[in-house]
Amino acid sequence: MNYLVISPYYPQNFQQFSIELANKGITVLGIGQEPYEQLDEPLRNSLTEYFRVDNLENIDEVKRAVAFLFYKHGPIDRIESHNEYWLELDAALREQFHVFGAKPEDLKKTKFKSEMKKLFKKAGVPVVPGAVIETEADVDKAVKEIGLPMIAKPDNGVGAAATFKLETEDDVNHFKAEWDHSTIYFFEKFVTSSEICTFDGLVDRDGNIVFSTTFDYAHTPLDLMIYKMDNSYYVLKDMDPKLRKYGEAIVKEFGMKERFFHIEFFR
């Protein structure tokens, strides 16, 4: 089996994936920006071959690297970066080289908050109202129909980056002034709960959950961003049956296969 890892060096705590794959007898190939000499010795020893590119952002350069490895080692069975930043690159390479896994079209349902909400609804999970924001008229409509307070985040984005909490008309005007009007936003009714729990785990290539667990967060992502706090969380010994029901329904609705999954809920 040929397993291609994109950016095997960074993040460093993910290097163990490559090391353990090699320990299982899998041929691990790597493409990254770092010089070969910079790779930690255990990682170097796990890679059958490492192809350095000048810029992982240059998809044509990366495709040429994949083509070379394909020619030298035979068909690539998997392409993974284990890094959210490179999801689109991973998907584009899989499509180009006909490799198992998520393709660009598949990412739409996990990268856009508006699309995720549609699937949450289909899975029977309670959600707060939301609206896609492309114009200032959309902003005014959301204020009228959803009502303040609301949370405003880029529709395509992760975490709490570029997030606005809208509680007053002044907050709305501030958002309009700061907004570049090209980034599509997603507004949602603000949830006052400070308790966040998660449904995390792994699915096999057929979409069956083979491991699941749950975390409780000490702080919300928004509080972490606003107050520059340190994050902490703990694993619960027992999972709330309602959380398991919702989590399993979401995983099934999204059609996840051979993936880690991480889903956050307000309690």
Residue ranges: model-predicted function:
Residues W179-I184, V191-Y233, P241-R267:
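Phosphate-binding core of ATP-grasp and ATP-grasp-like enzymes
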Residues K109-T192, R205-N208, Y233-K245, A249:
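Active-site nucleotide/adenylate-binding loops and adjacent lid/helix of ATP-dependent enzymes
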